């Protein structure tokens, strides 16, 4: 039960951090206070960092809801392409050519 609650709290913190309601630094400080040093703490901190860097809901090179492409078109660019969790305008993935 305790591990399930921990996962729910972590997912809630990631969601709040990625929405910009609180910043990543505060979530990282919370994890530093609550978790002992070790592999799990490092993995969770890495996961929070990756989730907080997310732009336009890009995940695993996929524009999940079309926000990347729409944002680039608003800027006058031809196409938006997800590179991991980042959105880049008019820059194709080099390994998919």
Swiss-Prot record:
Residues 55-95 form the BetaSPN-type CS-alpha/beta domain. Residues 1-19 form the signal peptide. Keywords: Disulfide bond, Ion channel impairing toxin, Potassium channel impairing toxin, Secreted, Signal, Toxin, Voltage-gated potassium channel impairing toxin. One of its GO terms (molecular function) is potassium channel regulator activity. Promising broad-spectrum antiviral agent that functions by alkalizing acidic organelles in host cells, which prevents viral genome release from endosomes and restricts viral entry. Is effective at noncytotoxic concentrations against viruses that enter host cells through low pH-dependent fusion, including dengue virus type 2 (DENV-2), hepatitis C virus (HCV), Zika virus (ZIKV), and herpes simplex virus type 1 (HSV-1). Due to its specific mechanism of action and broad-spectrum effectiveness, is a potential candidate for development as an antiviral drug. Expressed by the venom gland. The keyword Secreted applies. It comes from the Eukaryota. PROSITE patterns: BSPN_CSAB (PS51862). Pfam families: Scorpion_toxin_alpha-beta. It is found in: Secreted. Transmembrane segments: none annotated. Selectively inhibits Kv1.3/KCNA3 channel (IC(50)=0.95 uM). Both N-terminal and C-terminal domains are likely involved in the interaction with Kv1.3/KCNA3, since neither its N-terminal domain (1-36) nor its C-terminal domain (37-78) block Kv1.3/KCNA3 channel. Belongs to the long chain scorpion toxin family. Class 3 subfamily. Negative results: does not block Kv1.1/KCNA1 and Kv1.2/KCNA2 channels. Neither the full-length toxin nor the two individual domains (N-terminal (1-36) and C-terminal (37-78) domains) show any cytolytic effects on bacteria or red blood cells. This is Scorpine-like peptide Ev37. It comes from Euscorpiops validus.
């Amino acid at each position: 039960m305790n591990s399930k609650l921990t996962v729910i709290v972590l997912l809630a913190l990631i969601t709040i951090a990625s929405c910009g309601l609180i910043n990543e630094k505060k979530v990282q400080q919370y994890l530093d206070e609550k978790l002992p040093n070790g592999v799990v703490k490092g993995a969770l901190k890495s996961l929070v960092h990756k989730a907080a860097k997310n732009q336009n809901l890009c995940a695993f090179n996929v524009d999940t809801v079309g926000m990347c492409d729409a944002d680039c078109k608003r800027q006058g660019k031809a196409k938006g392409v997800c590179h991991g969790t980042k959105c880049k305008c008019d820059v194709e993935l080099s390994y998919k050519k």
